[in-house]
């Protein structure tokens, strides 16, 4: 059955409040409400964001007499791992999470020689209905809370810190999570306020956040033009990744149904506004599909439009289409891929083929379906 475009998540009971849902002011108020001294708010935040501890029983600077109360009110268990599978010689790990209400979603931890990246979900499911994406074909269950998003980051950070994966101390990869990409399940800008809260805590220094550089955080979108402009005005300095997948409205209306609301020209105008406002280059994501969007003339048109709209502030990531169950489409052959990249570059636009990880375990771009 063809999925319909959904912007508003179904109304469902939301999880209990967690420390990670709260900003600095709200944390102080919550601690005071528990009858604890105000300085405990900073201690709790430092334990969570700095030491990556989410169990008050392990917080040695917290009096034992109040740990149960703090656990109940500020550290409920929001998500539990259901299954973890690995590939790429253990360098890629996909985790299926289940929330309190039974909603499921996935995150993917990827280790590279010079960086460690976690791909996180912002929604359980997705309402954008892109026909080549397993997540979009599954429909939208609900938005994730800020804390549910941040728990994926904390879990990945904790894993990296504990295991180090045998890397040499002092290398950029090492035992530290270095990059966050909002490219898992869901449309991040359709869950704007909670994603924004998560981004702010990801980039804030401890004890108010994980202290990851804004330049190492990527927020993807299928092209919600007003929200792109709104994100630009936040001036957070994160990277914007625009899932374009076609340079012409006729095809993009089908491949990316949100294009029926905001056309290619409107989305590229918003991307230009983002680049001008933040000074950051915009990543253009383009899943290359055999005989669908890989024609030489579409490469020429893509290069022409991006050069006109963004100039040197655009970089195209060509993504060989990853297989999904029941899909009638497959990836373009390598000669067509090379020709496509060459033609985009000839138009003066930076273009490379993405190093795809996790295809064997359905953890690559467009494959996340939270099947448990």
Swiss-Prot record:
Classification via InterPro entries: Aldolase_TIM, Methyltransferase_A, RNA_MTrfase_RlmN, rRNA_lsu_MTrfase_RlmN/Cfr, rSAM
Record-annotated active site: 106 (proton acceptor), 365 (s-methylcysteine intermediate)
GO CC annotation terms, alphabetical: cytoplasm
Keyword annotations from UniProtKB, A to Z: 4Fe-4S, Cytoplasm, Disulfide bond, Iron, Iron-sulfur, Metal-binding, Methyltransferase, rRNA processing, S-adenosyl-L-methionine, Transferase, tRNA processing
EC number: 2.1.1.192
The organism's place on the tree of life at top rank: Bacteria
Entry keyword annotation includes Iron-sulfur: yes
Catalytically driven reaction(s): adenosine(2503) in 23S rRNA + 2 reduced [2Fe-2S]-[ferredoxin] + 2 S-adenosyl-L-methionine = 2-methyladenosine(2503) in 23S rRNA + 5'-deoxyadenosine + L-methionine + 2 oxidized [2Fe-2S]-[ferredoxin] + S-adenosyl-L-homocysteine; adenosine(37) in tRNA + 2 reduced [2Fe-2S]-[ferredoxin] + 2 S-adenosyl-L-methionine = 2-methyladenosine(37) in tRNA + 5'-deoxyadenosine + L-methionine + 2 oxidized [2Fe-2S]-[ferredoxin] + S-adenosyl-L-homocysteine
GO biological process, one term: rRNA base methylation
Record-annotated Radical SAM core domain positions: 112-359
Class of this enzyme: transferase
Cofactor: [4Fe-4S] cluster
Note from the entry: Reaction proceeds by a ping-pong mechanism involving intermediate methylation of a conserved cysteine residue.
UniProt-recorded name of the protein: Probable dual-specificity RNA methyltransferase RlmN
Species assigned in the record: Mycolicibacterium smegmatis (strain ATCC 700084 / mc(2)155) (Mycobacterium smegmatis)
Originating gene: rlmN
């Amino acid at each position: 059955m063809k999925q319909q475009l959904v912007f508003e998540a179904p109304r469902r009971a939301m999880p209990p409040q967690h420390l990670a849902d709260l900003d600095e002011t709200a944390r102080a108020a919550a601690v005071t409400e528990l009858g604890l001294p105000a300085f405990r708010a900073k201690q709790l935040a430092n334990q969570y964001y700095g030491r990556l501890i989410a169990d008050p029983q392990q917080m040695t600077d917290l009096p034992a007499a109040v740990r149960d109360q703090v656990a109940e009110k500020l550290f409920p268990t929001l998500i539990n791992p259901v299954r973890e599978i690995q590939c790429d010689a253990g360098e890629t790990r996909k985790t299926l999470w289940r929330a309190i209400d039974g909603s499921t979603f996935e995150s993917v931890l990827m280790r590279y020689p010079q960086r460690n990246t976690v791909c996180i979900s912002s929604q359980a499911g997705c309402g954008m209905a892109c026909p080549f994406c397993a997540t979009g074909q599954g429909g939208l269950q609900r938005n994730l809370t800020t804390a549910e998003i941040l728990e994926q980051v904390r879990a990945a950070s904790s894993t990296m810190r504990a295991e180090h994966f045998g890397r040499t101390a002092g290398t950029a990869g090492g035992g530290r999570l270095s990059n966050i990409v909002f490219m898992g399940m869901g449309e991040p800008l359709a869950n704007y306020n909670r994603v924004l809260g998560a981004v702010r805590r990801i980039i804030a220094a401890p004890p108010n956040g994980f202290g990851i550089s804004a330049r190492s955080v990527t927020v993807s979108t299928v092209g919600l033009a007003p929200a792109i402009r709104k994100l630009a005005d936040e001036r957070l300095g994160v990277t914007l990744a625009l899932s374009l997948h076609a340079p012409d409205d006729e095809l993009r209306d089908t491949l990316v149904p949100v294009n029926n609301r905001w056309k290619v020209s409107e989305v590229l105008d918003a991307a230009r506004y983002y680049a001008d406002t933040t000074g950051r280059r915009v990543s253009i994501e383009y899943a290359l599909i055999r005989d669908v969007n890989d024609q030489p003339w579409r490469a020429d048109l893509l290069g022409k439009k991006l050069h006109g709209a963004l100039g040197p502030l655009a970089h195209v990531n060509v993504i060989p289409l990853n297989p999904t169950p029941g899909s009638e489409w497959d990836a373009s052959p390598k000669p067509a891929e090379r020709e496509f990249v060459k033609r985009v570059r000839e138009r003066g636009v930076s273009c490379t083929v993405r190093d795809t990880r996790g295809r064997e375990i359905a953890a690559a771009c467009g494959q996340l379906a939270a099947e448990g």
